[in-house]
A protein has these predicted regions:
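Beta-propeller-forming repeat regions
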Residues: 1-269
C-alpha cells in the first residue's frame, strides 16, 4: 500500500479560535476560513479580508465557523459566536473582494463553548446548536422560503427535559442515535437525552447513564466503533488530558452499560 505523507504549510501569522473549509467564492474549490480572513484554494496562499473579530485577552470571540447559506443568495456565510460575547452570530458573505463581511446577531445565548450543526428534526437541513454551559439546550432553525432558500432569520426551540431537575447543559455536547430508532439523541456531560417524536414540542427523556468527566469535548462523537450495530461515544478532555471511547452494551434486562476505554491518556485537548 502507498504510504501517506503530510506537508505542513503556514498560512498566516494570525491566530484565531476556529477554522472552516468551504467554497467562499463559488469557483468549486474549497477555501479555508478562519477568524478575520479566508485563504483561497487550492494553494491557500492568497489571503482575503473578512473583518475584525473581537479579542478578549488571548482569546478571540469566534469559537465556531459553520458554513451555511443563511440569506439564500447562493453564497456560503458562516455561524460563529464565543464565550465572552455571549451571542450567537452569523457573518454575511457579500461576494465582494476584501469587503468586510457584516455581522448579524442570531440570539443572546450566554457563554458559548463551541457551536455545532446537526439535523435535529430529521428534515434533511442542519440546525444550529451552541454548547452553553449552565444554560438550557436550545436549537436554532433557519427559516427557509418556499424554494428552500434561507431567509436570514431563525426560530428558537428550547428543548423540554423529562426526568431531570434542570435543563442546563455542562461543558461538552454530542448528537447521534443512541436507541437505534433513527432519531438523533443528545449526549451531555453526565447522561443522554432520548429524542421524542417531535423534538421541539415533545419531552426529551433523561438517562443519567454515565459521567464523562469535568469538561468533555464539543463535539462528543456518536459512532458505531465495534460494528455491533450500537453507537459508541468518542470524546476528549476539553481542559485536561485524555482521549477515550465509551463502549455501549445492553445487559440481559436491556439496561444500557457504558464502559470507558483509553485511546490516548497523555494528550491534551
Amino acid at each position: 500500500p502507498m504510504a501517506l505523507s503530510f506537508r505542513k504549510s503556514v498560512l498566516s501569522a494570525e491566530r484565531y479560535e476556529s477554522a472552516g473549509v468551504f467554497d467562499v467564492n463559488g469557483d468549486g474549490i474549497p477555501d479555508i476560513v478562519s477568524g478575520g480572513y479566508w485563504y483561497e484554494g487550492p494553494d491557500f496562499k492568497r489571503q482575503h479580508k473578512i473583518g475584525g473579530v473581537t479579542a478578549h485577552d488571548e482569546y478571540y470571540d469566534d469559537f465556531s465557523t459553520i458554513a451555511m447559506d443563511i440569506n439564500g443568495d447562493g453564497r456560503l456565510d458562516f455561524v460563529t459566536g464565543g464565550w465572552w460575547g455571549e451571542t450567537l452570530r452569523w457573518r454575511e458573505n457579500t461576494g465582494v473582494a476584501d469587503q468586510d463581511w457584516p455581522m448579524h446577531d442570531i440570539a443572546k445565548t450566554g457563554s458559548i463553548e463551541s457551536t455545532r450543526a446537526w439535523d435535529v428534526d430529521g428534515d434533511g437541513d442542519l440546525e444550529i446548536v451552541p454548547n452553553t454551559p449552565g444554560k438550557p439546550l436550545v436549537v436554532y432553525k433557519l427559516i427557509r422560503d418556499a424554494n428552500g432558500k434561507g431567509t436570514g432569520k431563525f426560530t428558537t426551540h428550547k428543548l423540554k427535559f423529562s426526568g431531570r431537575e434542570n435543563d442546563h447543559q455542562g461543558h461538552g455536547l454530542g448528537f447521534g442515535d443512541i436507541t437505534g430508532n433513527g432519531r438523533g439523541d443528545f449526549v451531555l456531560t453526565n447522561g443522554w437525552l432520548e429524542a421524542p417524536e417531535n423534538p421541539y414540542e415533545g419531552e426529551w427523556i433523561w438517562h443519567p447513564d454515565f459521567n464523562l468527566g469535568r469538561a468533555p469535548s464539543v463535539p462528543i462523537l456518536v459512532v458505531d466503533l465495534n460494528g455491533d450495530g450500537k453507537n459508541e461515544l468518542i470524546l476528549g478532555e476539553g481542559h485536561g488530558y485524555g482521549l477515550t471511547w465509551w463502549e455501549h452494551n445492553l445487559d440481559a434486562t436491556g439496561k444500557r452499560i457504558w464502559t470507558s476505554h483509553a485511546i490516548d491518556p497523555y494528550s491534551s485537548q
